[in-house]
UniProtKB/Swiss-Prot annotation:
This is Probable endopolygalacturonase E. It catalyses: (1,4-alpha-D-galacturonosyl)n+m + H2O = (1,4-alpha-D-galacturonosyl)n + (1,4-alpha-D-galacturonosyl)m. The active site is at D219 (proton donor), H241. Residues 1-19 form the signal peptide. Its EC number is 3.2.1.15. Involved in maceration and soft-rotting of plant tissue. Hydrolyzes the 1,4-alpha glycosidic bonds of de-esterified pectate in the smooth region of the plant cell wall. It comes from Aspergillus niger (strain ATCC MYA-4892 / CBS 513.88 / FGSC A1513). It is an enzyme of class 3 (hydrolase). InterPro entries: Glyco_hydro_28 (IPR000743), Glycosyl_hydrlase_28 (IPR050434), PbH1 (IPR006626), Pectin_lyas_fold (IPR012334), Pectin_lyase_fold/virulence (IPR011050). Disulfide bonds join C43-C61, C221-C237, C345-C350, C369-C378. Keywords: Cell wall biogenesis/degradation, Disulfide bond, Glycoprotein, Glycosidase, Hydrolase, Repeat, Secreted, Signal, Zymogen.
Amino acid sequence: MVTSSSVIVLTLWAALVSASPVADPLVTPAPKLEDLEKRATSCTFSGSEGASSASKSKTSCSTIVLSDVAVPSGTTLDLTDLNDGTHVIFEGETTFGYEEWSGPLVSVSGTDITVTGADGAYLNGDGSRWWDGEGSNGGKTKPKFFYAHDLTSSTISGIYIQNSPVQVFSIDGSTYLTMEDITIDNTDGDDGEAANTDGFDIGDSTYITITGANVYNQDDCVAVNSGENIYFSGGVCSGGHGLSIGSVGGRSDNTVKNVTFYDSEIKSSQNGVRIKTIYGDTGSVSEVTYKEITLSDITDYGIVVEQNYDDTSKSPTDGITIEDFVLDNVQGSVESSGTNIYIVCGSDSCTDWTWTDVDVSGGKTSSDCENVPDDISC
């Protein structure tokens, strides 16, 4: 039974509700179909047309799979200016046609990019086609392998590179780049024909982290030419010229700061720990640390600092300072024909060095060191 009072209450409540303002519902614009496709699309490219197709379609794919791609001669596998968040996956064997040119064979750039190698995948440079014993100093023009330029907050991992014609990774203009579990195998060039096959050349970059690298080559395992906040750890360097700062000088940016090499092995190489600066130039090297570094079968110098790297016939100059240079637990062996430690500094350019638990033996003791900092033995 409905009483008259109940009817009155219900009528009043309905009137109040109808009189109250009601907020418009929030309307979220529907994403465009093309944007959804870009976010979700996985594209696979293969064969002799794979490189060209990938370069043309790269901004339409959130994941780019490169499966047994055969890059034509004189052509870069161009993966520059990728969409943010793109994932690149190498599968199978990636090959490159022969031509005398400067390269690069591969180039990647962008923000929040991930580059990975699938199990068993490798990039085969087949460098013997170019090797002539002269590297980048003459003979055939040889392509550099992999440009990691202008990468931000990105990761390259699990990449296996075999027989690069000349320098392998060029890292330039990048920041917050992590490289993990990279293998560079240029052992086929150990017969003397391969040269200047640097593993990682770093310039004008910040916050670069390289972990777990295995580098078998014929030049610097790592060469930091300029940049700040660079960290290399858990690496194995074999057959090359060691873990190097420089050469510093001769560029628009000649500053190296806050570099750490940690928990790594250098074996069967010309040099172990190395800093090289250019005669007569200006710049600075500071806050460089080598910690827990093991040397074995070093042929030339266990530890070497040269401030006349480009012309050893001249006296070292002090335009490029080397300050706060730390060695902590650097130990190992040099061959009897080599030299344990060799330091050639400018008159006032090498300061605030701290060496602890340094034991490099087996080679000769140099009598030609110059301007060795206080408390450091040459």
